[in-house]
Amino acid sequence: MKKVLCILFCVFIVLSFAFGSAAAEESGKSVTRVYFAGPLFSQAERDYNLKLTKLLEDHDYEVFLPQRDGIEFATLQDKTPEEKNKLLFEKDVSEILKSDVVFFVLDGRVPDEGACVELGIGYANNKRCYGAKTDTRSAELDLELNPMIRGCFIRLFSNYDGEKLFEEIDRFLSENEL
């Protein structure tokens, strides 16, 4: 599984260079745009993502949260699986390229594969990358975060108490900019 993630990560870093830096930084931009990457397939994950997004937005960041701001389900109804994949991929890549920051939630037995690709695209396009982790499974097994993922982050917020993680991020945002 780790090999697959590493291969996916490397392939999409290379592919992201093919997209180029189509979304060059606009001069005079006053709001920092954040692309939120992470698992979003269970209700608990979606609720957590919304809570963390609210914290970022309370600090005046403009957040693209795929589960909230991405392609609406209704627009995908008449599409083939290939068309759905293409639309979702292109929308997310476009939003990453328009963002200044990629904020990646690493919780899960392994980091979400799609979010790893999003991180790789962001990193390859000089986006500032931050991670957040509350999941204890890898710590209990004495496993380190994959260096290819960890190496992308300016900072990794890690606290196995979810509320304390929010407090840590809130303190950081009160004193620093992403």
Model-identified regions with their sequence ranges:
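Bacterial N-terminal signal peptides
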Residues: L8-S16
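General helical structural elements
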Residues: C6-I7, I154
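Positively charged n-region of N-terminal signal peptides that target proteins for export
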Residues: M1-V4
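Conserved catalytic or regulatory cores that recognize and/or transform ribose-phosphate-containing ligands
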Residues: G20-L178
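Composition-driven detection of intrinsically disordered, low-complexity segments
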Residues: I7-L8, Y123
